[in-house]
């Protein structure tokens, strides 16, 4: 299925609900944990809550600015979940404003920070060699994620990006571009 079509998220969510429901029916968990605001997680959360499985949601109450579906998906996930683990006090307040019980909301910080701290990364010499850099201080890592509800503006965004890159070519900076996420419009960016 074309992941850049406007119906792709809906189709992915519907398939995800079915697949996760089948898996949950087989393993019968006492608790299901889901993370953040992605449509794949939304599908899993719908399946778990509709099956009566206690569901914990991490990163509810956060805000993403800039025309994505993230906030509406995240807030929907929050309303469906039973337990809430937030990244900050503002997120906790938002969840409480949505009517969730204070006894089910816990401010725990951002779990991925712990993973980053526990991970081993390449040292400076490895990075310089791997990417052909003169040194690590002269790089820009660039990622452009699509904004699904503004898919028609991607070419206009690229004009601005292209102009910025032209100006950066005059410097001694090296630009490393990464792939976008899989949201609608990602293929066009690639």
Label for each model-derived stretch:
Residues 3, 80-154:
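A nucleotide-sugar donor-handling region in carbohydrate enzymes
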Residues 2-102:
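Active-site and donor-binding regions of nucleotide-sugar-utilizing enzymes
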Residues 1-3, 55-60, 109, 141-146, ...:
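Short beta-strands and strand-loop turn motifs
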Residues 129-178, 182-189:
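Conserved catalytic-core segment of nucleotide-activated headgroup transferases in glycan assembly
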Residues 16, 73, 87, 91, ...:
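General structural feature for long, well-ordered alpha-helical segments within catalytic domains
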Residues 16-24, 127, 161, 165:
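Generic hydrophobic alpha-helical segments
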Residues 39, 62, 112, 147-148, ...:
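Short, glycine/serine-rich, charged loops/turns that create anion-binding
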